[in-house]
């Protein structure tokens, strides 16, 4: 069974780390929406101070056919992004007619700022605050508290997905 996963949340909440771990566990294709935006020069068009809905929909238009090829071959796809426009999520779901699971990651702003300050490419407090404000305007899908250890958050997400079972060591196996 083929499906895709959307991991959304504020800057610094651990989206990429979590999405990459989920993708590795599922042997899925990992897609970083920010990378698509950067590679196709889609970050300049602004709407209310944020990257525009139009830019995100263009990113969806670019990546959806590639994702569909993986999905048609039975390979799951994991999307990682802020997804701060609901229209962007709806557009991606409309473009990819496959089973899907959406997760909104939650962490307090101070946790996001602290995590951002510890990475190689720091975005800064102002960017973290701005993205946090926009992303937290709505929840979509299952809400996951990511203030817990990484493995606990991974486990919570995997419990929602098909074809997974625990082995005796409480690790997931694909079936």
Labelled PLM ranges:
Residues 54-97, 101:
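Glycine-rich phosphate-binding loop used to anchor ATP phosphates in small-molecule kinases
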Residues 96-115:
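Conserved phosphate-donor/acceptor-positioning beta-strand/loop module used by diverse small-molecule
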Residues 7:
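Hydrophobic anchor at the beta1->P-loop junction of P-loop NTPases
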Residues 13:
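ATP-binding Walker
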Residues 10:
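P-loop (Walker A) phosphate-binding loop of NTP-binding proteins
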Residues 118-158, 163-175:
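Small-molecule kinase domains that catalyze NTP-dependent phosphoryl transfer to phosphate-bearing small molecules
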Residues 16:
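Walker A/P-loop
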Residues 20-68:
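Conserved substrate/cofactor phosphate-moiety recognition/catalytic segment
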């Amino acid at each position: 069974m083929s499906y895709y996963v959307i991991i959304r949340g504020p800057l610094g909440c651990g989206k990429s780390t979590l999405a990459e771990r989920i993708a590795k566990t599922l042997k899925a294709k990992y897609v970083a929406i920010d990378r698509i935006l950067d590679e196709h020069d889609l970050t300049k068009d602004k709407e209310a101070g944020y990257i525009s809905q139009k830019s995100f929909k263009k990113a969806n238009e670019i990546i959806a056919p590639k994702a569909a090829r993986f999905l048609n071959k039975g390979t799951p796809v994991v999307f990682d992004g802020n997804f701060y426009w609901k229209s962007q999520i709806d557009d991606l779901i409309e473009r990819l007619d496959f089973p899907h699971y959406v997760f909104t990651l939650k962490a307090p702003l101070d946790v996001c700022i602290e995590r951002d300050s510890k990475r190689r490419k720091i975005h800064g407090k102002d960017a973290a605050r701005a993205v946090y404000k926009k992303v937290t305007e709505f929840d979509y899908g299952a809400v996951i508290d990511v203030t817990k250890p990484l493995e606990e958050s991974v486990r919570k997400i995997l419990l929602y997905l098909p074809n997974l079972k625990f082995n005796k060591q409480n690790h997931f196996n694909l079936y």
